Regions:
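Conserved ATP-binding/catalytic motifs of P-loop helicase motor domains
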Residues: 1-272
Length: 272
């Protein structure tokens, strides 16, 4: 960075160069899966990158915040710096999830009896935690089903699917990758797709967007999203924005499994 600046006769403490270093640091950070950085850490990292004192970068950062090129949010008194689109995505997700959880619960008449019938049909009894998850999936608008390998997530999902289908609910099964979607389809015996295929990617105008969005909602009653740990903040924002007001979402995953490639640890943050 220094040699390029010298070649083009750019002063080391030029305002544009300082601001570019801050943006580069946050974008690099996003590429490593993080949506923000504490202010102090951002200044130190950018300082090491362009060999300028943190004090000069602090002035550039304040200007970026003033012009809203960057955004700041306090957590426990510590200022965290965001790229605007990532903060907007986080806040949008939080607002939509809050709206889902505050919505009235769904009625499920004869649920315990239907679970018993399912157990007789399957030839085995569900564990108490599995039954609790099944009940919540049938009554709650937003549910996280989590656990490590071998904890019965697939068995629980299949029970939920059977009960939803018995009620003629329209269910969309999806996962963040093609491999995960194929595995979900094999384990459930039902069609599953990637989130991108479910939302239908639109390349019109050279900008990647989705045909299904907050103005063209998905026509389903329940979305079951597998491998939630791999879903980044922007993709989850796109999915949850495309849900109808009455649509429910069931998120399945293991927070200790593969993280998302893009920024954001959605599953881990929801669990916490």
């Amino acid at each position: 960075a220094d040699s390029i600046a010298q070649y083009y006769h750019v002063e080391g403490d030029c305002a544009q160069r300082l601001e570019a270093a801050l943006l580069r640091t946050l974008r690099h950070n996003a590429g490593n899966g993080h949506t923000c950085l504490p202010r102090t850490q951002l200044l130190e990292t950018a300082s090491n990158f362009i060999h300028q004192p943190p004090e000069k970068l602090a002035a550039a950062l304040d200007e970026c915040i003033r012009t809203e090129e960057l955004r700041v949010k306090l957590f426990d008194g510590t200022p965290y710096i965001y790229l605007p689109d990532l903060l907007e995505a986080e806040e949008d997700i939080a607002a939509r999830l809050a709206m889902l959880t505050k919505r009235g619960k769904n009625t499920a008449h004869g649920l315990d009896k239907n679970i018993q019938i399912l157990e007789l049909t399957q030839g085995f009894a569900y564990a108490p935690l599995q039954k609790e998850a099944i009940r919540k999936a049938m009554t709650e608008n937003c549910l996280v089903l989590t656990g490590g390998p071998g904890t019965g997530k697939t068995t629980t999902v299949n029970a939920i699917l059977q009960l939803l289908e018995d009620q003629a609910e329209r269910v969309a099964l999806c996962a963040p990758t093609g491999r995960a979607a194929k595995r979900l389809s094999e384990l459930t015996g039902r069609k599953a797709s990637t989130i991108h295929r479910l939302l239908e990617v639109d390349y019109t105008g050279g900008v990647v967007s989705f045909i299904h969005n907050d103005k063209n909602l998905l026509k389903c009653d329940v979305v079951i999203l597998d491998e939630m740990s791999m879903v980044d903040v922007k993709l989850f924002q796109a999915l949850i924005a495309a849900l109808r007001y009455s649509c429910r979402i069931i998120m399945v995953g293991d927070a200790d499994q593969l993280p998302s490639v893009g920024p954001g640890n959605i599953l881990g943050e929801i669990i916490r």
